[in-house]
Design a protein with these regions (language model features):
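N-terminal "domain-start" segment that seeds a small globular fold
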Residues: 43-75, 92, 99
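Short loop/turn microsegments at loop-to-beta-strand junctions
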Residues: 58-59, 81, 179-181
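Short active-site neighborhood of thiol/selenol oxidoreductases, capturing the structured segment around
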Residues: 71-101, 115
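Sec/Tat-exported extracytoplasmic proteins
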Residues: 80, 89, 105-109, 137, ...
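Structural micro-motif
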Residues: 144, 155, 162-168, 176-183
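Thiol-/selenol-based redox modules, centered on thioredoxin-like
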Residues: 170-219
Length: 219
């Protein structure tokens, strides 16, 4: 008599491809961000050996910051600092400029480099308004100040001090027309570089030169 043995097929569960794709999609931006950060650091290291020119000295000034406290040349004395000119209701480039400025915080976090944003619409940009704007951007509040004050002083500071264009817009609702450049200032108050905040390599060049200054003028 012939005995037949029944065979049992064992199926291995198929991998959940949906989960794998979700994990992959989550990892892609993280890996991309890491690679871009690494590439920026490589560029910074290459550029940071170039000599820096001098463009004149920033005149003494005193304005008011987002906390309604006096802030100016005295508080910046002996520091390397970076300036920009913006206004909080800007319909044009200011959000990009401020975002790019915020990108400087992490790579310069232990350097002591100070960030300073001057409002070119001081009548609307009161300390209270600047504080709300600043809170959305600052990771280290003690290292980034937003300044307001008399229009005449800020206009003169932009045009005569930093050599940056500033004028009234053709349409009142569009606000002032101002420079989109970052300005690098050394410990002596001398301007050492200008950088287009809207250019793809603007932040990279600025970081490189800031690192150069930190070596040239250690604390």
């Amino acid at each position: 008599m012939k005995t037949e043995t029944a065979s049992v097929a064992v199926r291995t569960p198929a991998p959940k491809s949906g989960t794998a794709w979700k994990v992959t999609l989550l990892l892609i931006p993280l890996v991309t961000a890491g690679v871009l950060f690494w590439l920026r650091q490589v560029q910074v290291n290459v550029l940071s050996n170039r000599p820096l020119p001098s463009y004149g000295t920033v005149p003494s000034f005193e304005l008011v910051n987002q906390d309604a406290q006096p802030f100016g040349s005295r508080q910046l004395s002996g520091k390397i600092w970076i300036a920009d000119f913006i206004f909080t209701s800007c319909p044009g480039p200011c959000p990009i400029i401020s975002t790019r400025m915020s990108e400087l915080q992490k790579p310069l976090s232990k350097s002591g480099v100070h960030l300073v944003s001057f409002s070119v619409d001081p009548e609307k940009d009161t300390p209270e308004v600047l504080r709300v704007y600043a809170d959305k951007l600052r990771k280290e509040p003690l290292r980034w100040d937003f300044l307001t004050g008399p229009t005449a002083i800020i206009t003169s500071l932009s045009r005569d001090g930093f050599k940056l264009a500033l004028s009234e817009g053709e349409q009142p609702e569009s606000g002032p027309i101002h420079s989109t450049r970052f300005v690098l200032v050394d410990r002596r108050g001398t301007i050492r570089g200008y950088y287009d905040a809207l250019a793809p390599d603007g932040v990279t060049k600025l970081l490189a030169d800031a690192n150069h200054l930190l070596r040239e003028q250690p604390k």
